[in-house]
Amino acid sequence: MKMPASMEPDWKALLRVLRAHSATFYLGSLLFPKEARKGAWAVYAACRLGDEAVDGEGGGPEALEAWWAGVERAYRGRPLAEWEKGLAWALERWDIPFEAFLHMREGFLTDLGPVRLGTEAELLRYCYQVAGTVGRMMAPIAGGGKEAEARAVKLGQAMQLTNILRDVGEDLERDRVYLPLDLLRAHGVEVEDLRAGRVTPGYRALMAHLEGKARALYREGLAGLGHLKVGRAAIALAALQYRGILDKLRLSGYDNLGRRAHLKAWERALLLPKAFLAARFPPRPEGSP
């Protein structure tokens, strides 16, 4: 069903959100076919504005609830803001699970207060809530079924875990410690060590452990590319760029308390041929013949 002209989203407004917050995502999205590209823009804008409702200027509980009201309006087919219209447009075309947004909201609620995660299981749950859910939203747009959705969740978790490993120092400034407390204790690391910027042997061992977990999730997630009908190169490029941050982090000796690992523009560009190769010849799941 075609949306009334008054309900058609202002795609330029949504693009401004993308370009302001993630030029990398925008460039990758250009590898989608036209309609799927618009769907990716709409979903990204909705998710990004939820994140901004927590961390952006004026962010907080009230802003988050206002964002959530917008999600609900989009699902009821009564959007108001441009991003809501974009999401409603996507919902007319793909079966994007409401539950994924519900779980994302739970992750954003965690971010509102001081963050302390007790276990690795809690960390992975959080990674699912704020990023694995994006995989669930994107899988239908990319033409995937349940297997693709499950793999997309793994990829989202891998990318969020990469974010967490990259941003330990920045997150501390917001009183957020996503590194599981049980793993900190097991490696002889105190939160005060993090605040003091002490990159100890125990801390490096902890980082290496979580880096290994992230790499395993990338392997599981990238094996889902073969289940997608469109957008393989776009998704592969995003994953390879994030995985490249892990390489930078390792090369720095896991010194992420005072600096932030990132890829330069030319390094991201070099990954484009690899993304097309992964799209053409998707990695096989571990254990497959």
UniProtKB/Swiss-Prot annotation:
Q: In which pathway does it act?
A: Carotenoid biosynthesis; phytoene biosynthesis
One Pfam family linked to the record: SQS_PSY
Signal peptide annotation: none
Q: What is its EC number?
A: 2.5.1.-
Cofactor(s) needed for function = ATP; Mn(2+); Mg(2+)
- Name a biological process GO annotation: carotenoid biosynthetic process
Q: Which PROSITE patterns match?
A: SQUALEN_PHYTOEN_SYN_1, SQUALEN_PHYTOEN_SYN_2
Q: How is the cofactor bound?
A: ATP is required for the transferase activity but it does not seem to be hydrolyzed during the reaction.
Q: Which domain of life is it from?
A: Bacteria
| Keywords from the UniProt entry | Carotenoid biosynthesis, Magnesium, Manganese, Metal-binding, Plasmid, Transferase
Query: From the Swiss-Prot or TrEMBL record, what is one GO molecular function term?
Result: 15-cis-phytoene synthase activity
Report the protein's function. Involved in the biosynthesis of carotenoids. Catalyzes the condensation of two molecules of geranylgeranyl diphosphate (GGPP) to give prephytoene diphosphate (PPPP) and the subsequent rearrangement of the cyclopropylcarbinyl intermediate to yield phytoene.
Please report which protein family the annotation says this sequence is part of: Belongs to the phytoene/squalene synthase family.
Instruction: Write down what this protein is called.
Output: Phytoene synthase
Q: What organism, scientifically named, is this protein from?
A: Thermus thermophilus (strain ATCC BAA-163 / DSM 7039 / HB27)
